[in-house]
């Protein structure tokens, strides 16, 4: 049967109903079903002709392969979708009026705008019908529909035959699942729904009469899983309903007559006094104008909005975002506008409200248990809390040839702070998510920065009723996923057996799988998983009952195949190949270190909480007396260790002094505990720390200890602590840095490691075969300190003297290794680590040897410089007694650290980002540091400068404006050295940003009086065009030192070439090289260049290859070349010149190059 006319009638009826939201809903539904492209969807929204819009929609529906499915889907999702309006008296939890919601608006001049107007639709319809349509072309696409009737037996047989087709079953299952919401909100649609589903799923025909007794006062039962999203269409199956499915309806006692044949058109079923609206059964062609759908007398209440909209309510009611087939416009209303829902005159009866069904009891019970579990967890870590703001991070291409992505290091002033806690950040990020797509959010930071506290705070926040965009939050510490083999199911990932178990039965798991967009999965300490490599490209698991590996489950989530649409939150240390797994992350954040002010605040709170507030100032004085520990206190875990030792020293009442190294700090903390330990307890704990670190773990079973006494001692002394919420008897080291220290203790005193293998654990020159991955990244510094520092006050204070004597042999091995190192071959990060190791040794010979080998130019471009790095680098530069130039761009160095390095007398010049440097100047000027400000200005250089982004041009403009403000008289002697001494400037912004940013650069070019090389190509087509050349030419009189001008690939035509030729004589005495390679210069431009060529007395090389001038232009250039004996090369090969002409010109003058 040809359905075009029937579909067209339905669409025309819908478009004439004056409900623009239904029109938009229909178009959005077609877009979601991929029946429309986004471009065609946008065009239909702007279609001004209603009849044309109806024809285009009908043609789109007709082009679908299965016409019946198209028609049924359209009826379910568009025609019978209830319009939801919010009452004007509705208020949210904050007692804010929500009567005004988002005004989606309509495209100007479109049919949607016409529907929103106040014009009478019937008047417009007749007016349009009377218009002259003679000029329009009418195309008959289909014949009249077949008017034959079909009875129920034939229809059932047809459905049974189609069930043999897999695609047909899946498509009908799609319809059956997606239209649940459409039919469940009103009794009208509830009846139609059950009739439809019962008829599809019945294995036998209905009897002629069915008697359904209903008890008086019985409430209608609601279907389960009201919010349930349909799974992927490839996995949907049509589940036949039982013959008793009509029991879901509250029908009057009596008989229901089943007709085996239905009349053509609309058939109305109504029951007086039942409170039910009329039921319409459609068959055949829908009348277009003379038949009108009866309106419902039911009052449809507002649906609670989803959590990402204002006014969200209980999570047990479906939100607007959860309705699978309800487009967004159908759930919003215009400002100060309500839709008329008054009953028609032919309908009577009281209004009835519909109560939305809740979740299944098992799902609701599981959610409450999960919330109670998170509420019971302790939220505050040991010690005080100091609020820090997350910093947005990004990945960039590495500097090596592997093309791997790594975490970028922004300049200090370029940092983007994410205000608010992680819960607020998740709220903002979720607002930007694409529907149905998995969202990956990563929170990175060094050990001890508080990442796990951030993660636990999110789960606790959700348990307390916030983060309403999620129905379930699963907080999973990754150490609980350490089970070998292919024995993992999805429920094992969400609720690991080693955690406090929660009963997740199949019903709960099925609900979670069908509602992944309401799930937040938190994987804490992701670096502890061995299965983190290759997650984006490796094989992934499935939702089948068969178990798979943990890597397979994680790969399925990262590849957006399992729980597609969920939110995945990772916390990890930024190391190893983690960046490869995060290359497609939606958002990456970093937990920053303490600032100096925050570190002091932490110390004050620590002493206040411990009841010794009077020792605050004394403790701060002790810390300020040790600059290295002061710089390390930017790490919260080290700051806590400093507070603990300071408190112990002040309680002793003796002359207190903190140690000068990080190794000394931990030796002082663990020394008293080691003296009161069982025999060999510290060595045993050190061995466990090392073995766990080699396996990337930080937790262990209590049975790993040799005795209960050793375990009790470790827990009592605060070295180990119970893990949260685990069912097994597990312990974890109190901090990652403590585990590193204990691992270094094991290396320093054991005999199991050969001497020749010891240097690899300094991680300075990794081996090519079986390299040491340095997961315990604090081991190298502690190992150097334990081996080299005096035995009595270091290693001897922790272990027995006989055991400590082993360190003497290891000291000789490491001394020989350190003195053979060639510092010039080390990368910036390993050079800093070497400086730290040399400082921890406290051996003057090793420290001076390393310092004197430092090269004169030190580049830390792209390497993160922490406060401890700045301190040891400054000490090394002072010890070296030579001049240095530093490149500190993209290091993230703090302004105070930058000032400390710049103020060193041995630093003669430095490079840093323009924004960071100018921020330092402003800070020094405000502080009155005139001498340091002068040094910072004189040592700063930007030679050579390459502009790769608009921000680079803006910063350069700010630098020039700063100079003009300080030197309004334009005295060259008072110019900033960075501007006065700039000799090479490259401009590489590309063809899009180049034309936009070049006018700013041209405006400030005259300030660079010493500029010798101006490269406007730099392997990037900037395409500044003729306008750019015109602006550039105006600056030539001030660029008296310019020797090289590269204007290649800039889309210059004859107009620009003529402008350039007019201005070139201003550079006659300085310009040596001119390149106009690959532009659009024709004969006229070539002629103008030929005319000015004899005036360029200093020009040596000119390149005009790959332009568009012909033999005439080439001959003019060759003739002019005869008058220029100073020119050495004229490159002018171009495909528009005949090869014979070029050869002839080259024979006349050998200086003409055709290569």
From Swiss-Prot:
Name of protein: MHC class II transactivator
Protein source organism: Mus musculus (Mouse)
Gene, per the UniProt record: Ciita
Region Required for acetyltransferase activity, residue ranges: 171-210
Comp. bias regions, Basic and acidic residues: 224-233
UniProt induction comment: By IFNG and LPS. By STAT1 in the upper small intestine.
Record has Chloroplast as a keyword: no
Quaternary structure (record): Interacts with ZXDA and ZXDC. Interacts with PML (isoform PML-2). Interacts with TAF7; interaction inhibits CIITA acetyltransferase activity, thereby repressing transcription.
Keywords assigned: Activator, Acyltransferase, ATP-binding, GTP-binding, Kinase, Leucine-rich repeat, Nucleotide-binding, Nucleus, Phosphoprotein, Repeat, Transcription, Transcription regulation, Transferase
Summary of the function given for this chain in its UniProt record: Essential for transcriptional activity of the HLA class II promoter; activation is via the proximal promoter. Does not bind DNA. May act in a coactivator-like fashion through protein-protein interactions by contacting factors binding to the proximal MHC class II promoter, to elements of the transcription machinery, or both. Alternatively it may activate HLA class II transcription by modifying proteins that bind to the MHC class II promoter.
Molecular-function GO term, any one: ATP binding
Domain NACHT: 439-749
């Amino acid at each position: 049967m040809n359905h075009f006319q029937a579909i067209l009638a339905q669409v025309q009826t819908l478009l004439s109903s004056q409900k623009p939201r239904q029109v938009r809903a229909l178009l959005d539904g077609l877009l979601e079903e991929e029946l429309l492209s986004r471009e065609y969807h946008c065009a239909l929204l702007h279609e001004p002709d209603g009849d044309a819009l109806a024809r285009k929609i009908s043609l789109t529906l007709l082009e679908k392969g299965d016409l019946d499915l198209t028609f049924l889907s359209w009826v379910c999702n568009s025609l019978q979708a209830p319009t939801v309006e919010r009452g004007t008296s509705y208020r949210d939890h904050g007692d804010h009026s929500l009567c005004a919601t988002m005004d989606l608006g309509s495209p100007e001049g479109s049919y949607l705008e016409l529907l929103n107007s106040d014009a009478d639709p019937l008047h417009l319809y007749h007016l349009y019908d009377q218009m002259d349509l003679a000029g329009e072309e009418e195309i008959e696409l289909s014949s009249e529909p077949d008017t034959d009737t079909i009875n129920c037996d034939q229809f059932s047989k047809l459905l049974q035959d189609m069930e043999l087709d897999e695609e047909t079953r899946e498509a009908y299952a799609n319809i059956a699942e997606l239209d649940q919401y459409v039919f469940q909100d009103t009794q009208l649609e509830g009846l139609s729904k059950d009739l439809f589903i019962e008829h599809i799923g019945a294995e036998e025909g209905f009897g002629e009469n069915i008697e359904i007794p209903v008890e008086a006062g019985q409430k209608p039962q609601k279907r389960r899983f009201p919010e349930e999203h349909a799974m992927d269409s490839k996995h949907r199956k049509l589940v036949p309903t039982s013959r008793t499915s009509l029991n879901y309806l509250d029908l009057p006692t009596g008989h229901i007559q089943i007709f085996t044949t239905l009349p053509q058109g609309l058939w109305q079923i109504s029951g007086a006094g039942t409170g039910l609206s009329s039921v319409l059964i459609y068959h055949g062609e829908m009348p277009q104008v003379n038949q009108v759908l009866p309106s419902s007398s039911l009052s449809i209440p507002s649906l609670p909005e989803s959590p990402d909209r204002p006014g969200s309510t209980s999570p047990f009611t479906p939100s607007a975002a959860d309705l699978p087939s309800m487009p967004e416009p159908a759930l919003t209303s215009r400002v100060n506008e309500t839709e008329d829902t008054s009953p028609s005159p032919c309908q009577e009866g009281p209004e009835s409200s519909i109560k939305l069904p809740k979740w299944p009891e098992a799902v609701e019970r599981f959610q409450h248990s999960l919330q109670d579990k998170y509420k019971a967890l302790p939220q505050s870590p040991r010690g005080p809390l100091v609020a820090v703001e997350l910093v947005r991070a990004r990945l960039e291409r590495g500097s090596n040839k592997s093309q791997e992505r790594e975490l970028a290091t922004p300049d200090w002033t370029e940092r983007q702070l994410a205000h608010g806690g992680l819960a607020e950040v998740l709220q903002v990020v979720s607002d930007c998510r694409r529907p149905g797509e998995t969202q990956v959010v990563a929170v990175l930071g060094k050990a001890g920065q508080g990442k796990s506290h951030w993660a636990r705070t999110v789960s606790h926040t959700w348990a307390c009723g916030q983060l309403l965009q999620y129905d379930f939050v699963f907080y999973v510490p990754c150490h609980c996923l350490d089970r070998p083999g292919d024995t993992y199911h999805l429920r094992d990932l969400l609720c690991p057996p080693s955690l406090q178990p929660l009963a997740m039965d199949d019903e709960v798991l099925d609900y979670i799988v069908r509602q992944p967009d309401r799930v937040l999965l938190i994987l804490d300490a992701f670096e502890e998983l061995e299965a983190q490599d290759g997650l984006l490209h490796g094989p992934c698991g499935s939702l089948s009952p068969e178990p798979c590996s943990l890597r397979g489950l994680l790969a399925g989530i990262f590849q957006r195949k399992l729980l597609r649409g969920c939110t995945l939150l990772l916390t990890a240390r930024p190391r190893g190949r983690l960046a490869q797994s995060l290359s497609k992350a939606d958002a990456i954040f970093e937990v920053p270190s303490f600032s100096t002010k925050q570190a002091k605040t932490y110390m004050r709170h620590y002493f206040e909480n411990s009841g010794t507030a009077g020792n605050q100032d004394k403790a701060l004085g002790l810390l300020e007396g040790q600059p290295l520990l002061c710089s390390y206190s930017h790490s919260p875990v080290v700051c806590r260790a400093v507070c603990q030792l300071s408190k112990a020293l002040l309680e002793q009442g003796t002359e207190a002094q903190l140690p000068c190294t990080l190794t000394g700090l931990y030796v002082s903390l663990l020394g008293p505990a080691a003296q009161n330990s069982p025999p060999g307890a510290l060595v045993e704990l050190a061995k466990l720390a090392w073995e766990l670190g080699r396996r990337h773990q930080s937790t262990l079973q209590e049975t790993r200890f040799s005795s209960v006494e050793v375990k009790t001692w470790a827990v009592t002394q605060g070295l180990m602590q119970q893990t949260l919420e685990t069912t097994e008897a597990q312990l974890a080291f109190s901090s990652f840095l403590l585990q590193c220290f204990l691992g270094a203790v094991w290396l320093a005193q054991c005999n199991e490691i050969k001497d020749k293998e010891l240097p690899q654990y300094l991680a300075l020159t990794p081996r090519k075969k079986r390299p040491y991955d340095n997961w315990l990244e604090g081991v190298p510094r502690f190992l150097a300190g334990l081996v080299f520092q005096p035995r009595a006050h270091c290693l001897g204070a922790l272990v027995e003297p006989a055991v400590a004597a082993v360190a003497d042999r290891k000291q000789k091995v490491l001394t020989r290794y350190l003195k053979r190192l060639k510092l010039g071959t080390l990368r910036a990060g390993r050079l800093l680590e070497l400086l730290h190791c040399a400082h921890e040794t406290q051996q003057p010979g090793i420290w001076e040897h390393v310092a004197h080998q430092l090269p004169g130019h030190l580049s830390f471009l792209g390497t993160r410089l922490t406060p401890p790095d700045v301190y040891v680098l400054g000490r090394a530069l002072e010890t070296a007694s030579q001049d240095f130039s530093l490149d500190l761009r993209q290091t993230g160095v703090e302004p105070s650290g930058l000032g400390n390095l710049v103020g060193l007398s041995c630093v003669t010049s430095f490079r840093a980002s323009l924004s960071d440097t100018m921020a330092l100047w402003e800070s020094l000027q405000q502080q009155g540091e005139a001498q340091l400000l002068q040094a910072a200005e004189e040592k700063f250089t930007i030679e050579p400068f390459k502009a790769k982004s608009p921000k680079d041009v803006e910063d350069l403009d700010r630098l020039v404006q700063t100079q003009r403000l300080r030197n309004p008289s334009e005295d060259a002697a008072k110019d900033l050295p960075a501007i006065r001494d700039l000799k090479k400037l490259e401009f590489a912004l590309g063809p899009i940003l180049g034309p936009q940013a070049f006018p700013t650069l041209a405006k400030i070019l005259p300030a660079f009086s010493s500029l010798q090389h101006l490269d406007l190509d730099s392997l990037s087509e900037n395409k500044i065009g003729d306008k750019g050349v015109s602006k550039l030419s105006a600056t030539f009189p001030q660029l008296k030192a310019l020797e090289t001008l590269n204007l290649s690939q800039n889309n210059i035509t004859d107009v620009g070439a003529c402008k350039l030729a007019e201005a070139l004589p201003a550079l006659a005495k300085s310009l040596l090289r001119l390149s106009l390679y690959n532009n659009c210069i024709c004969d006229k431009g070539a002629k103008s260049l030929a005319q000015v060529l004899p005036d360029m007395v200093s020009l040596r090389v000119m390149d005009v290859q790959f332009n568009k001038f012909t033999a005439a232009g080439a001959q003019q250039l060759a003739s002019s070349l005869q008058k220029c004996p100073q020119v050495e090369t004229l490159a002018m090969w171009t495909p528009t010149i005949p090869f014979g002409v070029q050869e002839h010109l080259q024979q006349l003058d050998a200086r003409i190059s055709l290569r």
